[in-house]
Amino acid sequence: MTTTYCSKSWTDINIDFESRTLRHCCKAQGHSFPDQLTEQFISLGDVVKERRQQSLNNVAHSDCNSCWNDYSKGNSAYRDWANRWDDVFIKNHKTILNDDDKFIHYIEIKPDRTCDLACIYCSATSSSKIAQEEGVIIEDATNEDDYTVFKSWLKNYILRKDIIAEQIVIIFLGGEPTASERFYDLVDYIEDIAKLTDKKIRLEICTNANSKKFLMDKVITRMDTSKLAWGIGVSNEAFGEDAEGIRHGLDWSRFGENFKRYIQHPKTELIVLSPTINIFNLKSFHLYITWVYEQFKLYAPEKEFTWYGNFISWPDEMDISHLPKEYVKYIELAEHAIFKETDNKKHVYKENFVTFIDTMKQRLAASYNPDYKQVAQEFLERKQLVKKTDKLIKLMDSLDL
């Protein structure tokens, strides 16, 4: 059986309106829209059809170089925990996998890069705050016709009778999606479509949970009036001051208050904890995990939640593959924090998080650099110059064994 397939090639759409690019999987190579976007391009474009066919024939398609490059370095890759299919599924469905889009159910929308944070692993193309810091001008290629075509595709797709998934999940990315006016317009549109079908549709946001009160109130008010279930993806991976350093601009106290409001909301169906693992978060990761469990016990004991992590591969300086193997003790602390909560029935898909922890161990020290501390310090010093702060260097404490 082929070793190159991944369910993401069939189930995912990731559309970026500001840069006019489309991906099938957030880690895949992006492809520019044609001058005139078409519905065919969105879900059955030539490139993704080629990728699907090649991956079934054991060919490593260049779209997925992010994962292939990780494997070539001896690292674990996103595919290891993101792929949801196995050989039995492929065998039973192979006749319809080449030229079919009925498996799509995970639709990621990035309206723009408006953001209030300047995370040290992010870039100007994903954060307006970083672009402002660096004095970088990013071309906004937004085209109103693209939105018209996408809305038409989305409506036609949702109303189809042959869709296989029981639930369609529509995720808003950023930047910080709740700060984008486009977000509210699209939510209204999706709510209207949902009235025409009995399919289960969940709206989801990937948020930094750092919104000031006026914006947080606006999001909560929209959730209050929604007829759909919501998922809240929370982007964070560290605790307290470490989190504030990695996610420059974060207010940990405000994060905690917003986290509580999100998990307590009656329309919230699922909370997705989305840590981005890097050299500066390993030491406090177990503290963050413990804190998360405590929040649910105190404020939302009946709410389901899960973990869906990722690794930093860029900037390279923050990749845990360069650390020595002794740092495994911090991964083991994180593992212990999870196993302490074995009886928590509201932590769903727990096996996926256990697999992710295992891949952390595999990635650690895979490309060991004996000068990792010097590299990290120089990286932070460069960031401090741009961000006009002297506080980031405190993150070096996270590298104390």
Which ranges hold each PLM region?
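N-terminal pre-core extensions flanking Radical SAM catalytic domains
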Residues: 1-145, 163-164, 351-401
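A short acidic (Asp/Glu
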Residues: 10, 24-27, 118-123, 181-186, ...
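Acidic/polar residues at beta-strand termini and the immediately following turn/coil
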Residues: 16, 221-222
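Intrinsically disordered, low-complexity coil segments
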Residues: 17-19, 32-36, 196-199, 296-305, ...
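Core AdoMet radical
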Residues: 102-114, 125-152, 164-183, 193-215, ...
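Short, well-ordered amphipathic alpha-helices
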Residues: 153-157, 183-192, 216-221, 255-263, ...
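Conserved C-terminal portion of the radical SAM core fold
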Residues: 226-233, 251-400
